[in-house]
């Protein structure tokens, strides 16, 4: 099972940003964008790894589940209830 989140911290104070907070920027060969490291980059890496494995083998070797949520930065208030309500669907190897 892979877990990831797509929410990000608030932009305030916006005047401290070196580039527009809602616009990806490349500086010195690095990507600067809200969520690019926490956690959208990790989520993207997981999807690309799955895609590469499927292209090479045609199937995944395990029963894989992916949970993506949008409340991690504020404590994931609904995640526990969601997992409890969907235990059978979330069963993975």
Regions found by a protein language model. Give the residues of each.
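Acidic/His- and Gly-rich active-site-bordering loop/insert found
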Residues: 1-38, 53-62
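Acidic/histidine-rich catalytic neighborhood of metal-dependent amide-processing enzymes
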Residues: 37-93
